Swiss-Prot record:
Descriptive protein name: NADH-ubiquinone oxidoreductase chain 1
Keyword entries, A-Z: Electron transport, Membrane, Mitochondrion, Mitochondrion inner membrane, NAD, Respiratory chain, Translocase, Transmembrane, Transmembrane helix, Transport, Ubiquinone
Locations listed in the record: Mitochondrion inner membrane
Topology relative to the membrane: Multi-pass membrane protein
UniProt record, GO biological process: aerobic respiration
InterPro entries: NADH_UbQ_OxRdtase_su1/FPO, NADH_UbQ_OxRdtase_su1_CS
Source organism of the structure: Drosophila tristis
PANTHER family reported in the protein's UniProt record: NADH DEHYDROGENASE SUBUNIT 1, NADH-UBIQUINONE OXIDOREDUCTASE CHAIN 1
Function description: Core subunit of the mitochondrial membrane respiratory chain NADH dehydrogenase (Complex I) that is believed to belong to the minimal assembly required for catalysis. Complex I functions in the transfer of electrons from NADH to the respiratory chain. The immediate electron acceptor for the enzyme is believed to be ubiquinone.
Amino acid sequence: MEFILSLVGSLLLVICVLVSVAFLTLLERKVLGYIQIRKGPNKVGLMGIPQPFCDAIKLFTKEQTYPLLSNYLSYYISPIFSLFLSLFVWMCMPFFVKLYSFNLGGLFFLCCTSLGVYTVMVAGWSSNSNYALLGGLRAVAQTISYEVSLALIGFKILLFSLL
């Protein structure tokens, strides 16, 4: 019974995160519309509320293209794996009801975020383009450099909280 409740809770968490991201993009588009002195995306429904769902339908019905000489499987699997890794990070967040019990939640957070680096590199490599590969390697270098400082700051906070 506890497994079913944690599964339902994690599914509800994932759905809420994805819907909130969709509405944050709607908020961003509205704010940019007001900044540029034009109306934002308010043509669909009441004040543009169904706009994220219309954007999702448009996104899923688009034609899928891929580079001719690319590694097709890893080219499409790496962004999906990156999405799953970013959603796994939400599992270690503390809520009122504990979904999963993590003794080392900070280490799980650092591991999931550091694994996300490799998906960018695999996506750049699998496109079989030198520019995409260089961009992926640049993103890996930037992400590793900020993760080292993030880990050091986190360990320093942990150390000072124990004193």
